């Protein structure tokens, strides 16, 4: 069905319908799209030493990325001289900021085959902004934010190489982006490569409801909103290789942003489906995150409205290749996996069900590999993951507030984590301290990795997170520390807060003695005093088992081999409680809105006395986790109501019988209620693969109800809501996953001797079109643009508009529309455009409607 109307649209380059195509091939694709500094460039200098012979020329416009924590340290300059075969350029103005340009090496201090060296490369990226083919919005757009936009839809094709898109995008308008595949489904063979998008008012490159697009060697610089934007979750199989995005700015507010995440979660690479390939890309500064792989439960918005993706769950899809990517100078994170943003309110939700899930759609461990990722100068966490599973291999994380915040069942292998490197420029770190691996929900395994630069008073290679659901089964194996005063462990959260119950529920198993010198010992944090808002330490030592010693050089309690540690949690407990261990340590004022949590030592003849500081809830559950099968913990509750019933434990007649019981048991002795929890329910498989700790974690759950009734043994009516039985561990990267580029589908034309020429007045019956005219190119006609021109609009209806490559040409128009198998062409793949060509999209009326019906009956080349 032919297109008959274009409503509320202006300043566009658009192709609609199968067979319609936009072909732009500029000769500047032969230049390097971006490179890095080869040595540091300091403030006041005006010469850049570059890694590559770039092919850049005098007059080219470039941008130098920030290498500090502030993306705003990026700056633009014009080249006035080229030296050393293109490996050095002289700038029109001195630099206003320092830009780091050195590499650093770290070694694990071992010899022979065990030796390992890591290279930290924080050299500034330098990007080419200008190209000889330019598509741009008008100058007024710098005031009103109404630039041009380009789009292909309904089966049209787009092949872009060596082009510059400047002052594009229309601020606050959904769908009005600089470059945009719109609901295209499979576009195998289409690409955007070695092009630049800069000073955009609405994102960079958009892939929307489209699969198998190819983006390579592009630069997206200084945008409002996301840089590389995969829009609805229906985008998969797309390949992004060696692209650079930096200075992605947040929209002013949610109300005015086209989507709310542009204001609250803006990212250089916004990926709403893990089934895409990202290789060698760089995110060099955004107001939120570098890379964010969002967890979508369903395809949303216009893609969902097509009906093509009913029942398709983006977050359940297998990961594509994620390898060799780098992110820095991001206000929050270098890499985020999981979580979700409400695109109406802008609220970021990290919690279930917003986890990357894969598998069978349940909240299980996920098999994926993050390979060779480098993240530095992140204001928050370099790597932030919500969801279980995954392997992080050969990472380099440096100069971040916190290196990792992983949900659990993940491995970190062959990685380097640095608190402060040689590129520590004194930028303030949130909270004032640097932490490496944050120990959180389920077990993490850290192997064959090196830590350096954590020498500040409250710095630590390992730290615990303050929230609940922490694990005592984190493990390290073959980890090493730089001889620079690095602290292995800090008992503080990254923000310096130690006043939550998660502080008391962390354990780190030293499998091979990497930290303690003795294989199998377990580190737990020493907490002697906290502020008292959520918990008060009355008697210290709660986190130390029998025989534990405190090692100040490590910063933690060292528990002897064989110590069994679990986590005890009370849910639905709004009443503060005091917990006293039978050998003396005591916590009081334990309170939270929905649960409390603390560490317990199993099978040590210890009894934990729980005394509610008021009437307990009428119903609460008691869970113990992170224990080997059959391990037990004994609790004594003081003055529970007489009519309290216990679900999940068998009644026994004496305390001795309870002590000897092999299953979960309850014994009442006057006002005291004794509970024995025995871990028999498989929770998850550990990743350690070492006999130093049991490879499986078990749990138990008992429900306490006030209000009468009998004790009901194992009839627990609230099953655990999390299936964590999927084994996790090292995931092998599959080379078969690496994408192969589909053959190009570019379809261009040669200019023929008899083709009509814009400069030929006979084509126009003696009067060339003017600024108020619309040019129509009908089916079978070819119009060659060979001179500068300014018109109100151009409609290519089945014909072709080809820009001749004999001189520099400027074309100004409100819009250029290609329909019904028409073609707009600048250069060809095997013969790129050599001269300068600039298309300026000057339309500035967002309410403009174009009624095409009067044109569809026309033939030939006409002025309308």
Residues covered by each model-derived region:
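Acidic/polar low-complexity surface segments
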Residues: 2-12, 21, 28-36, 129-143, ...
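Right-handed parallel beta-helix/beta-solenoid
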Residues: 717-766
């Amino acid at each position: 069905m032919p297109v008959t109307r274009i409503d509320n649209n202006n300043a566009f380059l658009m192709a609609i319908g199968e067979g319609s195509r936009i072909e732009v091939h500029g000769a500047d694709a032969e230049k390097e799209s971006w490179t890095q500094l080869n040595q540091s460039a300091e403030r006041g200098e005006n010469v850049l030493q570059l890694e590559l012979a770039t092919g850049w020329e005098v007059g080219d416009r470039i941008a130098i990325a920030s290498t500090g924590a502030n993306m705003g340290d990026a700056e633009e300059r014009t080249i006035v001289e080229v030296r050393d075969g293109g490996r050095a350029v002289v700038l029109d103005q001195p630099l206003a900021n320092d830009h780091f340009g050195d590499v650093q090496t770290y070694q694990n201090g071992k010899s022979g085959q065990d030796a390992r060296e890591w290279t930290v490369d924080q050299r500034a990226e330098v990007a080419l902004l200008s190209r000889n083919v330019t598509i741009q919005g008008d100058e007024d757009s710098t005031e009103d934010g109404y630039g041009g936009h380009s789009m292909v839809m309904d089966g049209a094709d787009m092949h872009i190489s060596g082009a510059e898109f400047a002052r594009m995008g229309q601020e606050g308008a959904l769908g009005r982006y600089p470059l945009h595949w719109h609901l295209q489904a499979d576009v195998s063979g289409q690409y955007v490569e070695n092009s630049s998008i800069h000073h955009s008012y609405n994102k960079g490159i958009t892939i929307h409801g489209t699969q198998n697009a190819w983006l390579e060697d592009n630069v997206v610089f200084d945008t409002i909103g996301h840089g590389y934007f995969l829009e609805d979750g229906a985008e998969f199989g797309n390949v992004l290789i060696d692209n650079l995005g930096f200075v992605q700015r947040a929209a002013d507010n949610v109300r005015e942003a086209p989507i709310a995440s542009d204001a609250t979660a803006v990212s250089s690479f916004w990926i709403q489906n893990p089934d895409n390939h990202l290789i060698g890309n760089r995110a060099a500064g955004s107001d939120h995150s570098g890379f964010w792989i969002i967890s979508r439960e369903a395809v949303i918005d216009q893609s969902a409205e097509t009906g093509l993706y009913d029942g398709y769950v983006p977050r359940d899809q297998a990961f594509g290749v994620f390898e060799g990517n780098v992110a820095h100078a991001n206000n929050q994170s270098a890499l985020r996996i999981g979580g979700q943003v409400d695109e109406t309110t802008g609220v970021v939700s990290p919690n279930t069900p917003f986890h990357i899930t894969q598998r069978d759609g349940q909240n299980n461990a996920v098999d994926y590999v993050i390979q060779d990722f480098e993240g530095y100068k992140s204001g928050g966490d370099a790597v932030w993951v919500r969801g279980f599973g995954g392997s992080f291999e050969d990472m380099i994380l440096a100069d971040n507030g916190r290196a990792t915040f992983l949900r659990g069942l993940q491995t970190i292998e062959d990685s380097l984590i640095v608190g402060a490197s040689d590129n520590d420029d004194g930028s303030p770190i949130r909270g004032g301290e640097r932490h490496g691996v944050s120990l959180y929900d389920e077990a993490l395994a850290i192997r064959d990795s090196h830590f350096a630069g954590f020498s500040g008073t409250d710095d630590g290679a390992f730290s615990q997170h303050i929230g609940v659901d922490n694990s005592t089964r984190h493990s390290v194996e073959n980890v090493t520390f730089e001889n620079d005063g690095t602290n292995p462990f800090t008992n503080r959260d990254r923000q310096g807060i130690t006043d939550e119950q998660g502080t008391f529920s962390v354990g780190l198993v030293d499998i091979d003695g990497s930290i303690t010198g003795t294989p199998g010992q377990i580190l737990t944090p020493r907490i002697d005093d906290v502020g008292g808002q959520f918990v008060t330490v009355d008697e210290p030592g709660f986190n130390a088992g029998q025989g534990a010693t405190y090692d100040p050089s490590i910063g933690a309690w060292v528990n002897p081999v064989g110590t069994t540690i679990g986590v005890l949690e009370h849910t639905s407990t709004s009443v503060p409680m005091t917990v006293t261990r039978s050998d003396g340590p005591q916590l009081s004022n334990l309170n939270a809105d929905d649960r409390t949590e603390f560490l317990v030592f199993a099978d040590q003849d210890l009894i934990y006395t729980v005394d509610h500081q008021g009437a307990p809830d009428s119903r609460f559950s008691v869970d113990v986790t992170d224990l080997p099968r059959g391990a037990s913990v004994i609790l004594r509750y003081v003055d529970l109501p007489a009519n309290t019933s216990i679900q999940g434990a068998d009644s026994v007649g004496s305390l001795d019988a309870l002590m000897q019981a092999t299953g979960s048991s309850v014994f009442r002795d006057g006002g005291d209620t004794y509970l024995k929890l025995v871990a028999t329910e498989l929770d998850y498989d550990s990743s350690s693969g070492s006999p130093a700790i049991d490879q499986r974690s078990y749990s138990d759950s008992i429900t306490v109800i006030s209000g009468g009734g009998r004790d009901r043994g194992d009839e627990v009516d609230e099953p655990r809501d999390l299936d964590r039985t999927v084994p996790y561990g090292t995931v092998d990267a599959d080379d078969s996953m690496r994408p192969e580029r589909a053959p190009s589908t570019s379809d261009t034309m040669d200019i023929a001797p008899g083709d009509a020429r814009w400069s030929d007045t006979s084509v126009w019956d003696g009067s060339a079109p003017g600024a108020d005219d619309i040019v129509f190119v009908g089916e079978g006609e070819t119009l060659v643009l060979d001179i500068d021109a300014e018109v109100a609009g151009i409609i290519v209806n089945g014909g072709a508009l080809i820009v001749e490559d004999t001189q520099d040409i400027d074309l100004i128009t409100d819009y250029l529309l290609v329909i019904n198998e028409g073609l707009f062409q600048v250069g060809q793949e095997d013969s790129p455009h050599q001269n300068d060509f600039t298309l300026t999209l000057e339309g500035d009326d967002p309410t403009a409607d174009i009624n095409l019906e009067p044109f569809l009956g026309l033939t030939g080349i006409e002025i309308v």
